[in-house]
Amino acid sequence: MADLAGAYADARRRLGELLAGLDEAALATPVPACPAWTVRDVLAHVTGVAADAAGGTYFAGAADAWSDVRLAAARDEWTAGQVRTRRQRPVEALVAEWAGLAATLEPMLAGAVPPPPGSPAWLRSAPVADLAVHLHDVRGALGRPGDRDAPATALGLRIYARWLGQRLDQGGRPALRLRAGDQEWVEGTGSPAASLAADPFELFRALSGRRSLDQVRALAWDGDPEPYLDLLAPYPLPPSPLAE
C-alpha cells in the first residue's frame, strides 16, 4: 500500500493546524457526523485511537461490528471511553499527547517496527482511514471545507472500499464496480451486478458512513442499488444529509 505513515503524519498536521486557531466556542461546535461529539471530542478520539493502536489496546472487534450489534455497542463504548478520559484536557495537551504517540505509531505504520503482539492484521490501515474521515468531519462542522487532495483522503477511499469488498463477500452479496473520477475497480468476488460512480471525495464520504440513505440513493448507480445499501458503510448512515 502507499505511504501510510506519510499520509497519517500529513493529516495529523492538517488537523492540528486547523484546530490551533480555534477559540473555546469553536472547539465546542457540535460535529453532525459524530452525534454527541464536539470538535474537541473528535481530537480526543483520534488521540485515543493513536494511543490504542500504539499500545496494543485497539478494539479488535471493530472490523466485525457491522454485523454484530454487541460488537457495535462495544466499539461505541470503546470510542466513547477515549473521549471521556480526555474531555477535560486542554487542546494543547491533547495535541502534545498525540505528537508523542505519533513517534511510536508512525514508524509502525511505515512498517519499520512491528505492531504490538496480537494486533489485528488491518491495524496499520485503520488509523489512517479513521483520521481521514474525522479530518473532514471537523471541517464540515466548522464550515471550512478543504483537504480533499490530502493523501489520507485518497488512501481513506481505498481502505474503506476494500472493507466494503470484505463485507460484500461475508454478506453473500454480488461484487460492485466503483468509479471514482478516472479510477475504476471492482470490490467483492465475481462479476459485479451494479456500478457506483461518484467524485472520489463523495464516494469516500459515502463509504465511510457520512452520507444519508437519500444521498446514497441519489448517487450515480448503474443497476439496482438495493443489495448494497445496508452494507455500503460499516456504520449506521446519518438520518439527515451531511454537506461535507
Predicted regions and their residues:
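An N-terminal domain-cap segment
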Residues: M1-A44, G55
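Alpha-helical scaffold segments in carbohydrate-active enzymes
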Residues: R14, D41-D52, T104, D130-D137
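Structured surface interface patches that mediate subunit assembly and partner/cofactor docking
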Residues: M1-G6, T29-P30, P35, Y58-V69, ...
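Short, helix-capping/interhelical loops that line the mouth of catalytic, cofactor-
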Residues: M1-D3, A51-G111
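Short amphipathic alpha-helical segments enriched in hydrophobics
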Residues: R12, L19-A26, V46, A50-T57, ...
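Acidic-glycine-rich active-site phosphate/pyrophosphate-binding loop
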Residues: E17-A20, E106-A112, R177
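Hydrophobic faces of stable alpha-helices that mediate helix-helix packing
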Residues: A9-R12, W98-E106, V128-L131
